[in-house]
Amino acid sequence: MTINDLLKRIDDYAAVIRAYRPLSEAEVKELDAYYRIGMTYSSNALEGNSLTLSETKVLLEDGITVGGKPIRDCYETTGHARAYDHMLTIARSDSLSISENVIRRLHYLFYNGIDPEAAGEYRKGQVFITGTAYVPPAAEEVPECMITFVTELAEKRGKLHPVELAAYAHRRLVDIHPFQDGNGRTARLLMNLILINQGYCIVSIPPVLRYDYIVALQQAQREKAPSDEAFVKLIAECEIEAQKDYCRMFRIELPKP
């Protein structure tokens, strides 16, 4: 399917979901908790966190850590959940404006338990992304790159389909790699901030798609003939799966493709 085909299906499904809304307060609370666990698990697992979905659930719901697991993995889990909660709050604002402070706050909440001094702060040195020839900007270039990024994000809003905009925000933040660590998780939170604000479902990229996810990012970052088509398609396909999951939970019948 082409990107346009995928976006049309997304909008068809979104119309069905909108017709079912609004949810009750209890349903919203249940849904938020469901995605809080699922997104925290999947986003961390993409980065090598060893906690399983069940272990993530026990830690977040009961505060019980699993013996033998690295303490950092536990901090990543609780930190991501805090950042997720904040992301939801601002995503539901009618006057959302994505600024550097918004992005830095997401990173701060995720990373503060791991390294308080680096949380929410732009990196001071060069970073490298394993498995790719792409090299992120030098540390001294990061502030200017971020200013340009948030400006472009505002300019593209209304011109791109919300799913394309969310994919762009995700991919571009990973390109810049503004923080010492935690860039991927911050990028996925930013992506979902845009999706939720525009009435779409939360996207969790399952660990089983890690290879496809990395390859799609690499295609967008390559020096010769870069293309973000595969990455946008991947995010669009994940959005469709999220919509199907949403409809399954609420027994909503979707139109046949």
Feature map (PLM): residue ranges:
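FIC/Doc superfamily catalytic core
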Residues: 1-257
